[in-house]
Amino acid sequence: MTAALWLGLSGVLSAAAQAAPLSHDVTIGYVQIADDSRYDDKEGPAETTIAPPRPLPGAEMAVDEVNIDAATVGRLDKLDHEEAGSADALTAQVDAMAAKGEHWFLIDAPDEAMETLAKAERDKDVILFNISARDDALRGGACQPELLDVIPSRAMLADALAQFLVARKWPNVLVLRGPLPDDKKDAAAFASAATRFGLRIADTRDFIVSNDPRHRDQDNIALLTGGASYDVVYVADADGTFARSLPYATIRPRPVIGATGLVPTAWSWTWERYGAPQVSHRFKKRVGRDMTATDWAAWLAVRALDDALRESHATSTEAADKYLLGPQMNIDGAKGPPLSFRAWDHQLRQPILLTTPDATIADAPMPGFLHQTNVLDTLGYDRPETKCKF
């Protein structure tokens, strides 16, 4: 990063006010939404229901871990967990906590709520760590200087799959797209990745899950996967009901990727390198379940903040933020290369794991994909492509 660019960035971060003094002990805000539909019970196999877990335990584990080292310098990190009653109440909740002196916040909120919050907090003395919203717009036209995206974007996940297909020489893809808004966003991200990496979309077909005979053509896997030539099937299905039955049911014997089969993710218990098994084991021993991608994002956000505080010896929040977003930041995320935030959109650059339920098959960037400065920037929107303007 050039000196001029960094001076411009630091000016944006400090536009709201003079640097706030840094308390010896640090309280990290954590805010989630009570009625977040992403955590509603979802239909599972054999008439079961599945309740997706919230990522709070990841942050709690990280706070306990960093306090072991922080205690040696007399610092204690605390987590202030609050719940907004609704998406509309999210900004008021963050503002109330900021009024108590809290500066750093982990935010677990869906795309639209995150965008509204980040816009409302622009030029305020806060930093928001996005640990669960994947919308590309948050890293693009709706970006804000106070928003740091820890969870990977849809574009990063799609690019990882596209690189894998190129590496395996499976260039022809049949896309099956569900009816939900997230399905359409995921399919659009994959289509963009396909164009970027030279894949060919053989066809895009919409499915719905229904017992209505009028929708037979959109609910029958054999019909949906017949009549086209392709190497692999990509399925966009946010709730997973359709995707669950897709592998081994396609009319042609082809692998399935996307929402099932080979799935791109920030974290998996099957990842066995760079200290990852120890992280996964500590989490499972503590919480009683496997660590998810959002658990990892919450854990990583706390670890990143601790690294910035410890390495910078900052005496103000502004100085800590400058280090956190600076070129010298190297975060150990148990995924191999050091992680850091991109200057142009504040997305955390990171490898993407390509996993099945039982194994990590590959981690992207795939070998052979090169970049002039950082190979991790082959995933997601690079500086020349970004629509983000702080």
Regions found by a protein language model. Name each.
Residues 17-390:
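Extracytosolic ligand-binding ectodomains
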